[in-house]
């Protein structure tokens, strides 16, 4: 038993409170492909009414949802301490852009999309106003990405229009070429993202 050295555990799951469990589970099913492994009525005396455990990979649960009718969406959350966003990583830019297309067909549009030098990210808002980031690594491996993160320039993101990136990809550009062209400003959106309207 080690009692002297800090062991580095992995982040395993996040828990969210909600008054709207069914809508939340459906949203995360559509976006992340979650499967609910268990949904139980909380015992008497619990601060919650229902608890659901869900995952989209081999881990028993990545998200837990705690439903209680007494909670409400914080309309002033940008002034309060909180979890700012939760991120999920795709293996490739094609997977990320393909997800954007799939979600758009379902009427789900992002709040923001950007090339952040070390990664490309698209941000959505769930039914309770939580910000969910979908991203992919712009470099070959995690070690290279870490070095890029350490050397970030003052401007840490370049806004992009996923539609323009998809058109360039279909025209034959590689994922790396898309990154280079995004940084050069080629895929800038026609209109600015209204980030102030989101509950960041």
Per-segment meaning from a language model:
Residues 5-8, 15, 55:
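Conserved N-terminal glycine/acidic-rich loop preference
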Residues 13, 51, 61-63, 85, ...:
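Histidine-centered active-site/metal-ligand motif
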Residues 65-68, 79, 84:
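A broadly used, surface-exposed interaction patch
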Residues 1-3, 70-76:
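Short beta-strand/turn micro-motifs at beta-sheet edges
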Residues 68-70, 91:
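Histidine- and/or cysteine-centered catalytic micro-motif in compact active-site loops
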Residues 2, 9, 19-26, 81, ...:
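Vicinal oxygen chelate
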Residues 17-63, 67:
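Core segments of cupin and vicinal oxygen chelate
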């Amino acid at each position: 038993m080690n009692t002297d050295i800090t062991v580095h555990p992995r982040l395993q799951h996040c828990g969210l409170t909600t008054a709207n469990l069914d809508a939340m589970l459906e949203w995360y099913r559509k976006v992340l492909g979650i499967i609910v492994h268990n949904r139980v009525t909380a015992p008497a005396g619990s601060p919650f009414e229902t608890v659901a455990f869900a995952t989209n990979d081999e881990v028993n649960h990545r998200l837990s949802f705690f439903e209680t009718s007494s909670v409400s969406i914080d309309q002033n959350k940008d002034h309060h301490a909180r979890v700012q966003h939760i991120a999920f990583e795709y293996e490739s830019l094609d997977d990320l852009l393909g997800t954007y297309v799939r979600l758009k067909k379902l009427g789900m549009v992002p709040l923001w999309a950007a090339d952040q030098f070390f990664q490309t990210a698209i941000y959505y808002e769930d039914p309770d106003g939580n910000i969910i980031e979908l991203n992919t690594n712009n470099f070959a491996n995690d070690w290279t990405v870490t070095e890029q993160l350490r050397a970030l320039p003052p401007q840490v993101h370049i806004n992009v229009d996923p539609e323009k990136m998809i058109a360039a990809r279909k025209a034959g550009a590689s994922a790396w070429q898309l990154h280079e062209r995004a940084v050069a400003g080629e895929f800038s959106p026609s209109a600015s993202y209204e980030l102030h309207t989101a509950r960041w």
